[in-house]
């Protein structure tokens, strides 16, 4: 009677390790969060809802306040005084954690360190809060006014929050037994800050804002 060949398989354990990296902004970070008003207008357009009223008057300070990702409660008083009061009460701001991972993945691919973008998605993870945000530390945000082109080349004025002298901490989890070492991952994240950046007018989008490096 023939016996079955037994094959011994070695299962390499996934040994996760979490480290904290500090990134420091090299150029100011410009935020442009989607406001509830913008989301509603987009939904109405997609649903072909007929609008009977005229376009609301632009409120620069409100646009500025709503352009930022608030970790604390956004002020209901959309005035300079309301914003200053929120700052005095310890307002905190964040940024989507996915932006930093996407910057790293894109930079690695652009520099020829990885054959494609898909292969890096499961190599490391960046921890965020319950809303997948990381806190941005900086000077008090300032309001910037920019002329932009929207739609069919129509000119518009945008008011957005600019963060100077900013920094953040990234909690990175990776597999110590994986294909990429911690040193390689750190270099990929560092390249992401130079090649791609985050936020509006970042290097990846023909700008020079939102660049950063890993502090040593």
State the predicted function of each range.
Residues 1-216:
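RNA-interacting cores
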């Amino acid at each position: 009677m023939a016996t079955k060949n037994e094959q011994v398989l070695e299962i390499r354990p996934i040994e996760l390790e979490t480290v904290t990296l500090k990134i420091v902004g090299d150029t100011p970070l410009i935020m442009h969060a989607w406001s509830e008003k913008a989301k509603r207008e987009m939904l109405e357009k997609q649903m072909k809802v007929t609008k009977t009223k005229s376009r609301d008057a632009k409120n620069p300070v409100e646009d500025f306040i709503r352009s930022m990702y608030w970790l604390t409660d956004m002020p209901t008083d959309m005035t300079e005084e309301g914003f200053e009061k929120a700052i005095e009460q310890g307002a905190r701001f964040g940024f989507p954690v996915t932006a930093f991972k996407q910057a790293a993945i894109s930079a690695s691919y652009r520099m020829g360190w990885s054959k494609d973008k898909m292969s890096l998605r499961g190599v490391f993870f960046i921890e965020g809060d319950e809303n997948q945000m990381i806190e941005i530390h900086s000077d008090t945000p300032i309001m910037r006014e920019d002329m932009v082109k929207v739609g069919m080349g129509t000119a518009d004025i945008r008011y957005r929050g600019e963060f100077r002298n900013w920094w953040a901490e990234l909690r990175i989890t990776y597999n110590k037994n994986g294909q990429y070492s911690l040193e390689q991952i750190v270099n990929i994240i560092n390249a992401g800050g130079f090649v791609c950046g985050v936020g509006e007018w970042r290097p990846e989008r023909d700008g020079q804002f939102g660049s950063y490096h890993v502090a040593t």
